[in-house]
């Protein structure tokens, strides 16, 4: 029983969010010299984690509206992550992966757009009555790739589709269970 360890639902959500955030941003521990070849695998891993933690996103707006302190901590944490991603993108500009002509404003807007699609894509698919499958994740990846490609120095470094790659960690269909997903 989580209520034994935490005094409120909000504390549970923040603890779960911290765990989710760590899993979502494991890529930042990967040497940036390995990217972008690993971007497709990172995206699939992120979609899987987001689906596993979908209950947080279904409760998040209600909890944030109800608790100003929780909202403050959540926004501060999210903004910190956005800054980490901004620094990462600037490194990609320095390494001639992203175009040097990108302004900070363009990078920030790209980050926000990719963030929104990455976080909410599977909810969009699920609420539309579709099954959460590798194909659904691939479509989310394709949307993100379409956003990023115009900013790449060499568009060929980012595959248009995961189907063209050997992504072995993603099953053809994810089985939806009460506790999350299984492959």
Label each PLM-derived region with a short phrase.
Residues 70-97, 106-123, 139-150:
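Amphipathic alpha-helical packing segments from all-alpha helical-bundle domains
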Residues 17-24:
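Short, basic, alpha-helical segments at the C-terminal edge of helix-turn-helix-like DNA-binding modules
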Residues 28-56, 76:
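Hydrophobic alpha-helical connector segments
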Residues 127-183:
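C-terminal peripheral helix-coil segments that are non-catalytic and often amphipathic
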Residues 3-16:
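HTH DNA-binding helix-turn interface
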Residues 44-51, 59-65, 146-151:
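Helix-loop "lid/cap" segments that line or gate small-molecule binding pockets
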Residues 27-31, 57-64, 96, 121-129:
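Secondary-structure edge/capping motif, primarily at the C-terminal ends of alpha-helices
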Residues 58-61, 73, 100-101, 160-161:
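Short, hydrophobic secondary-structure boundary micro-motifs
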């Amino acid at each position: 029983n989580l209520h034994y360890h935490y005094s409120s639902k909000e504390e549970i959500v923040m603890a779960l969010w911290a765990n989710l955030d760590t899993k979502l941003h494991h890529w930042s521990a990967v040497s940036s010299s390995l990217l972008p070849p690993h971007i497709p695998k990172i995206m699939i891993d992120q979609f899987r984690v987001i689906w596993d933690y979908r209950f947080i996103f279904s409760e998040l707006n209600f909890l944030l509206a109800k608790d100003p302190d929780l909202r403050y901590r959540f926004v501060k944490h999210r903004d910190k992550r956005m800054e980490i991603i901004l620094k990462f993108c600037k490194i990609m500009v320095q390494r001639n992966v992203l175009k040097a002509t990108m302004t900070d404003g363009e990078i920030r807007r790209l980050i926000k757009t990719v963030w929104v699609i990455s976080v909410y894509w599977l909810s969009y698919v699920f609420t539309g009555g579709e099954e959460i499958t590798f194909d659904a994740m691939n479509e989310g990846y394709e949307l993100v790739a379409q956003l990023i490609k115009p900013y790449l120095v060499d568009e060929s470094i980012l595959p248009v589709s995961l189907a063209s790659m050997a992504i072995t960690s993603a099953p053809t269909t994810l089985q939806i269970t009460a506790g999350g997903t299984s492959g």
